[in-house]
Amino acid sequence: MSHCSCHDKPQHSLLPAAYRILSITRHTPLEWNFRVAVDFPAHWGQFVEVSLPRVGEAPISVSDYGDGWIDLLIRNVGKVTSALFTLKEGDNVWLRGCYGNGYPVDTLRHKPLLVVAGGTGVAPVKGLMRYFVENPQEIGQLDMILGYKNRDCVLYKEEMATWRGKHNLVLTLDEGEADDRYQIGRVTDRLADMTLSDIDTMQAIVVGPPIMITFTVKMLLQKGLKPEQIWVDYERRMACSVGKCGHCRMGEVYVCTDGPIFNYAVAQRFAD
């Protein structure tokens, strides 16, 4: 698969275009995956603006991509997403993008990688995890700690089941009872229990609610990682997606153009 950046797309525009929905997968009552046929390049960690005429638009992360398609995990939480949930396979959805920088795959290759993600924050990093699970020669040790509120909120259950045994995958729940598939507690509880090897070369990715990112990064630093080894995903109030409206500005950076993936050596300087 190509790792092209959508920054190179010559037709990059503020005007959305219609694209066909190939399939819809219902992970939970509130979270559905829309696979959409596209003719533009995409990269894990980037995002598109998804819209419907006379309804509005919303920024949605690219959770995975392939030859001529992208996956968008959409949570039904507002006017736009509620309207999207009335669509079916074969219908059109309007997209503009891709936008943002995406994950630094070349920097991550052949190094130990720890991914810590919570809730729908699993979606922006899901495709990257799948790539490394399916291409173990491209990565060192791969550890994944994924947290959800309860069993009913777990995303990508079928795929996660195939990942077990190939790499260290920990699924942890805020609520419920532990069994052979799930542990109980927050992602930081599981991280506290983990012994990290190859600290000097390890890379870490943290995706989720802001408070989760804050405490997870703090723990990683306490465990010996340097800010330069940590990557965070800040998805904040993006509107125009081209750095003009200022809604997503954090200090001197714009999440939509400078991010949403930031090295923590940069992110720690944000004056929010």
UniProtKB/Swiss-Prot annotation:
Transmembrane segments: none annotated. Coiled coil: none annotated. [2Fe-2S] cluster binds at residues 240, 245, 248, 256. Induction: By sulfite. Repressed by oxygen. The keyword Secreted does not apply. Its cofactor is [2Fe-2S] cluster; FAD. Its main location: cytoplasm. Gene3D superfamilies: Nucleotide-binding domain of ferredoxin-NADP reductase (FNR) module, Translation factors. Pfam families: DHODB_Fe-S_bind (PF10418), NAD_binding_1 (PF00175). GO terms for cellular component: cytoplasm. Pathway: Sulfur metabolism; sulfite reduction. Binds 1 [2Fe-2S] cluster per subunit. Binds 1 FAD per subunit. One of its GO terms (biological process) is pyrimidine nucleotide biosynthetic process. NAD(+) binds at residues 166, 168-213. InterPro entries: Cyt_c3_hydrogenase_gsu, Dihydroorotate_DH_Fe-S-bd, FAD-bd_FR_type, FNR_nucleotide-bd, OxRdtase_FAD/NAD-bd, PyrK_electron_transfer, Riboflavin_synthase-like_b-brl, Sulphite_reductase_B. It comes from the Bacteria. Disulfide bonds: none annotated. It is found in: Cytoplasm. Keywords: 2Fe-2S, Cytoplasm, Electron transport, FAD, Flavoprotein, Iron, Iron-sulfur, Metal-binding, NAD, Transport. GO terms for molecular function: 2 iron, 2 sulfur cluster binding; flavin adenine dinucleotide binding; metal ion binding; oxidoreductase activity. FAD binds at residues 113-129. Residues 14-105 form the FAD-binding FR-type domain. This enzyme catalyzes the hydrogen sulfide production from sulfite. It is strictly anaerobic. It is regulated by electron acceptors rather than by cysteine. Belongs to the PyrK family. This is Anaerobic sulfite reductase subunit B. It comes from Salmonella typhimurium (strain LT2 / SGSC1412 / ATCC 700720). The gene is asrB.
